[in-house]
Amino acid sequence: MEDIIRIIQDGSLDGEKYFQSLKERQGKENAEIIKTVKFIIDNVKENGDKALIEYTSKFDKVELQSIEVTKEEIKAAYSKVENDFICALKTAKENIEEYHSKQVQNSYVITKENGIVMGRTVRGLDKVGIYVPGGTAAYPSSVIMNAVPAKVAGVNKIIMTTPPMKDGFVNPSILVAADLAGVDKIYKVGGAQAIAALAFGTETIDKVDKIVGPGNIFVAMAKKSVYGFVDIDMIAGPSEILVISDETGNPKFIAADLMSQAEHDTLASSILVTTSKELIGKVIEEIKLQVEGLSRKEIILEALRNFGAIILVDSISRAIEIGNVVAPEHLEIITPNPFEYLNDIKNAGSIFLGSYSPEPLGDYMAGPNHVLPTSGTARFSSPLSVDDFVKKSSYLYYSEKALRNVNDKVVKIAETEGLTAHANSIKVRFK
C-alpha cells in the first residue's frame, strides 16, 4: 500500500494534472446506455404497467403480480428492523424537519396608491416522485432527505419508486423510512423504467411534476431524458470530500473522514489540503491502519489511488482558495477556530466545521440536506431544499386610474420594441 494516495506540492504540474483528472473522471456519455434508456422510456410510455412488470422480471429477476406496496407490507416492515434503528430515524427526521422548516417562504402582497395590488403566491408542487435505490443496498437516509423537505414544502402527494429485493418485497428499512417521512404511495419499480413511469404516468403510477433521488447511470440518464417533461433535482456525479486542516488536525479523524467518501465508489474523490508536512505522514499511516477493518476496503483503496490527493500548501487561506476552485460536495474545516474561515468559503455544497462535525453526521442526522451539488457545480448550485418543492406565481391588479397613469409609458416601451399589438392592448382601453 505504498502509493495509497498521491501527495502533491501546491503549484506543481502534478497538481494541474490531478485537477484535470477530476474534471474528466465521469467520461463521455455512453451512446449504448442512452439508446437503451430511450427504448425503455418509449416502452413504458406505450405499454405502462405491463412494461414495468416485464422489466422487473428482466432486471431484478422478480415476478410481480402487483407493483404497489400494500399497507400490510409497510406495517410488517416495522417488525423486521431494530427498534434502535426506528428511534434513530425518528430523531433524524425531527432534525431534518426542524432545519428545513426555516426555509419556508411565505406569499406576500404589496399595495400602492390608486388601487395597485401585486404580490407573489408560494405553494407546494402537486405531485413529486422520489427514486430510491433498492435491493440489498438500502439507503433509508435518502428517503428522509428527499421526502421531508417535500412534506415541509406542502407537496400534495409524494410517490416513491424503488426496486424490490429477490423475494419480491421492498427492503424493510426503506419502507419504515418512507412511512415515517410521510410518503403517500410506494411502488416496486427501479431503474430507468421507474423514472419513465413517474414522468409520464402508467395505469397505476401517477405522473408527477418533479423527480428527485439518486440512482445508477441508467437512472441518471433517464432523469436527464425526461427533464423538460418534468422537473428534476440534479444529475449527481461521484461523491467528493475536501478537508482543510492545519497541524492541529487529528490524523485519525481526517483519515476516517476521507475514507467515508472513498467507500461510495471508485470514482469518489477524497482530498486533504494541509499546511502540515507532519500531518500528511500521520494521515497516511491512519488510512493504512483503519482501512483493514472496513468492509469496502478494496473500493476505498482504489478510489484513493485513482482520485484521492493530499495537497501541501503554505497557508490556510491558500487551502481555501483551492477549496473554492474545486467547489466540493462536502468541505471540512479542521482548525482551532473554523468559524473564522466560514465566510471565505464561496463554493461548497455543505460545510462541516471542527473536529466533531464529520461529514457522515450530515449524511444521516444533523438536519442540513445530504443531497448536494457535485462535480464542481457547487459554484452555481445549492443543496436540495424546501425551495425545490414549491412553485411561485406573481399576480397584479391595476385599477383604471392606475393604468391610465402609466398608459403612455407602457405604450412607448411596447412601440419601441416594435410590438404594436402590445401597445394596442393598452391604447384600446382608453379610446
Curated annotation (Swiss-Prot):
NAD(+) binds at residues 131, 193, 216. Gene3D superfamilies: 1.20.5.1300, Nitrogenase molybdenum iron protein domain. It catalyses: L-histidinol + 2 NAD(+) + H2O = L-histidine + 2 NADH + 3 H(+). Substrate binds at residues 239, 261, 264, 330, 363, 417, 422. Belongs to the histidinol dehydrogenase family. Catalyzes the sequential NAD-dependent oxidations of L-histidinol to L-histidinaldehyde and then to L-histidine. This is Histidinol dehydrogenase. It comes from Clostridium acetobutylicum (strain ATCC 824 / DSM 792 / JCM 1419 / IAM 19013 / LMG 5710 / NBRC 13948 / NRRL B-527 / VKM B-1787 / 2291 / W).
